Design a protein with these regions (language model features):
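Bacterial N-terminal signal peptides
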Residues: 6-14
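Positively charged n-region of N-terminal signal peptides that target proteins for export
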Residues: 1-4
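Serine-esterase "nucleophile elbow" of acetyl-processing enzymes
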Residues: 20-79, 87-99, 104
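A generic, residue-level signal for flexible/boundary positions that often mark functional hotspots
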Residues: 11, 41, 231-233
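Sec/Tat signal peptide C-region and signal peptidase I cleavage site
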Residues: 15-19
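Alpha-helical cap/lid subdomain in secreted, periplasmic
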Residues: 88-271
Length: 272
């Protein structure tokens, strides 16, 4: 009798084990949604809204609310901080828990050049320090600094494009290397593109149509940028809608190339 009971118990146990082995596997819990990537743009009028490529760049990002354009016309690497504008960037970085990563694109140079009282910075002793400090502070707050060399101006002499921003671009290249930060060499790429298209085509990228007295107009409106939004007039520094679209696409392509991990953060070409 005891033997029979033991056999019955063993059979029941075997059937239970077999049933457990053949039962449908449990469905794993769904993975939490991936946090978005955020972009913050810091710079001067060539990046700012209405006069630069920044808003057009943000429009190419998958989620418009994850791209914040804080660039401001007339600002240099020194005055942007002196006015307290960098405080806003740091505040955003401190509140970055909702984002997988925050990339801060930093572009200065135009207003760091000599002849702009209250904004010009010394190329050797101030500008490199300012750019390095921006990069270091972004990293300290958990962000990713992306240094951008200044957008070229579009003034030609005897069919050759001038590049008086080259020294500032060189400093940014060196700073990016020293800080191990991604570099978008917009100066080199925009210079090559504008030189290739020539003066007439380059002038179509401006904020307003080229007037008959082009030399006087360009000199009057583009030589010294006041500390504010650029006026809607022809010059060879600022950008209209066509110029913003053109150079924002260039910057987007540079981001995809230099930071391939976030190449998927932009809309398909057909939707841009």
């Amino acid at each position: 009798m005891k033997l029979l009971i033991s056999l019955i118990a063993m059979t029941a146990l075997s059937m239970s084990v077999h049933a457990a082995e053949t039962a449908a596997p449990t469905t794993p819990a769904p993975a939490p949604p991936l946090k978005p990537v955020r972009f913050i743009l810091v710079g001067d009028s060539t990046m700012a809204n209405t006069s630069g490529y920044g808003d057009a760049f943000c429009a190419r990002v998958n989620r418009a609310n994850t791209c914040i354009n804080l660039a401001k016309g007339g600002r240099s690497s020194g005055s942007f901080r002196a006015e307290g504008r960098w405080d806003e960037v740091q505040g955003l970085l401190r509140g970055a828990a909702a984002y997988r990563a925050t990339y801060v694109l930093i572009q200065f140079g135009h207003n760091d050049q000599p002849g702009k009282p209250g904004r010009s910075t010394d190329l050797k002793t101030e500008f490199p320090v300012n750019m390095a400090r921006y990069a270091q502070e972004v990293k300290a707050l958990g962000g990713v600094p992306v240094l951008v060399t200044p957008l070229t101006r579009r003034s030609f002499t005897d069919k050759v494009l001038e590049n008086n921003l080259q020294p500032w671009a060189d400093v940014i290249r060196a700073t990016a290397a020293a800080q191990k930060a991604p570099l978008l060499d917009l100066n080199a790429e925009s210079y090559a593109a504008v030189q290739a298209m020539g003066e007439d085509e380059a002038d179509t990228l401006a904020m307003a149509p080229r007037p008959d007295k082009v030399a006087e107009a360009a000199a009057a409106s583009g030589k010294v940028e006041v500390a504010g939004a650029a006026k809607s007039a022809f010059d060879r520094t600022h950008l209209g809608a066509k110029g913003a679209a053109y150079f924002s696409h260039m910057v987007m392509d540079e981001v995809k190339r230099e930071i391939p991990d976030i190449a998927g953060q932009f809309k398909p070409e057909s939707e841009q």
